[in-house]
Amino acid sequence: MATAEPETSTNPSNSEEKNEENEQQIVSLEDYIKHPLQNRWALWFFKNDKSKTWQANLRLISKFDTVEDFWALYNHIQLSSNLMSGCDYSLFKDGIEPMWEDERNKRGGRWLITLSKQQRRADLDRFWLETLLCLVGEAFDDHSDDVCGAVVNIRTKGDKIAIWTTDYENKDAIVHIGRVYKERLGVPPKVIIGYQSHADTATKSGSTTKNKFVV
């Protein structure tokens, strides 16, 4: 007499539920993992109070070294276009202060973008954010080590944005940085941007400072 063997079957719904649980655990874990940046950065704010010294007007806002903390900070502060005239934002690598006298800056210079009054509404915030992304994303390949930081100056006559580099004689690095920066901002090819050394800028007014390099 034949005996019926007990059926062994797997419940497909159970295995699917376990897979979903595993996927949820992975997603939840990724939510807590921050993405580190190559460098630690410091954001500074300058407010031009003539009753105080220049150094007293410069204030460190915060430091960050992850993608998530960058966006948290950026979304928390005022846009550049909303700042009062005479104010600056500066983003520099940790350990470098946003002043010409700093050891990493004193033999350096800057790629300078000058904006018209009309460009404050149209381009300023977009240009500044793209500048920040170039810095924290190390957009300049092997020459990103030459980058010290960037500054946006809010001024009545016209705003300025600049990327500072550490050595005004390092032509290869400077030109590469300038070309990448110009492309990232979407500046038309016919528009020329210039690079000036801090030493020249310190001894001359901005309108007469000679460009060492142009792209």
Swiss-Prot record:
Function field: Recognizes and binds the 7-methylguanosine (m7G)-containing mRNA cap during an early step in the initiation of protein synthesis and facilitates ribosome binding by inducing the unwinding of the mRNAs secondary structures. Also promotes export of a subset of mRNAs from the nucleus to the cytoplasm.
Residues covered by region (Disordered): 1-23
Protein name: Eukaryotic translation initiation factor 4E-1A
UniProt xrefs under Pfam families: IF4E (PF01652)
Family: Belongs to the eukaryotic initiation factor 4E family.
One Gene Ontology term from the biological process aspect of the record: regulation of translation
Superkingdom of the organism of origin: Eukaryota
Bias type Low complexity, positions: 1-14
Cellular component, GO, one term: nuclear speck
Subunit and partners: Interacts with eif4ebp3l.
UniProt GO MF annotations: RNA 7-methylguanosine cap binding; translation initiation factor activity
Organism in which the protein naturally occurs: Danio rerio
Entry keywords, A to Z: Cytoplasm, Initiation factor, mRNA transport, Nucleus, Protein biosynthesis, RNA-binding, Translation regulation, Transport
Tissue: Expressed in all tissues examined, including gill, fin, heart, intestine, muscle, ovary and testis.
Chain positions recorded as mRNA binding sites: 54-55, 100-101, 155-160, 203-205
Main location: cytoplasm
Protein's cellular compartments: Cytoplasm; Nucleus
InterPro entries: TIF_eIF4e-like, TIF_eIF_4E, TIF_eIF_4E_CS
